């Protein structure tokens, strides 16, 4: 299965609680954190929710 590299590029301060929870679910805590996740529909949905705080490769 394909994987996606997700990097946090913006702070979570002042964001909606649901968006903070989504970032936690993705495994991102701090600016500059990078995680590798499987390319599934669930992960794609999470990415769509917080697209403005992350970078995808």
Curated annotation (Swiss-Prot):
Cellular component GO terms held in the UniProt record: cytosolic large ribosomal subunit
Pfam families tied to this protein: Ribosomal_L30
GO biological process: translation
Assigned keywords, A-Z: Ribonucleoprotein, Ribosomal protein
Organism superkingdom: Bacteria
UniProt KW Ribonucleoprotein keyword: yes
Record bears the keyword Nucleotidyltransferase: no
Alphabetized GO MF terms: structural constituent of ribosome
Family under the similarity heading: Belongs to the universal ribosomal protein uL30 family.
Cited HAMAP family: Ribosomal_uL30_B
Complex formation: Part of the 50S ribosomal subunit.
Listed NCBIfam families: rpmD_bact
Protein name as catalogued: Large ribosomal subunit protein uL30
Naturally occurring in which organism (per UniProt): Buchnera aphidicola subsp. Cinara cedri (strain Cc)
Gene: rpmD
